[in-house]
């Protein structure tokens, strides 16, 4: 079994990363493989609902950020943990945009 831990913070070594590392450690103790996926600090586009992902085999037409990499990593995972800093009672915009596009384009992987 493999669990993908998605870090929705732009800070690779911030509090969200520490929390995900704790989760990964406990999963590893239970014999579960883990992979941490860092969304990074670069901008992530919003989904525009163009529908081209249906013609691209479950990949988003925007190929200039990490969303297609996230979909590819999700295809190899059996479970997910999503981590995000909380800004004004919401997860980061970065993780929301990434998940909107990943679920729309690559929903089969989730």
Language model features with spans:
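Cysteine-cluster motifs in flexible loop/terminal segments that predominantly coordinate metals
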Residues: 42-74
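Helix-loop-strand module that forms the ligand-binding subsite of alpha/beta enzymes
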Residues: 61-110
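Cysteine-centered iron-sulfur cluster-binding motifs in ferredoxin-type domains/subunits
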Residues: 7-8, 12-14, 45-54, 78
């Amino acid at each position: 079994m493999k669990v993908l831990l998605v870090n929705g913070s732009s800070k690779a070594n911030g509090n969200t990363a520490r929390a995900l590392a704790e989760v990964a450690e406990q999963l590893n103790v239970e014999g579960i493989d883990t992979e941490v996926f860092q969304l990074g600090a670069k901008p992530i586009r919003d989904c525009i609902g163009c529908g081209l992902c249906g013609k691209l085999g479950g990949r988003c037409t925007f190929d200039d950020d990490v969303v297609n990499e996230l979909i590819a990593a999700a295809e190899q995972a059996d479970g997910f943990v999503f981590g995000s800093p909380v800004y004004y009672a919401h997860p980061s915009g970065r993780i929301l945009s990434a998940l909107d596009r990943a679920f729309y384009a690559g929903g089969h992987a989730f």
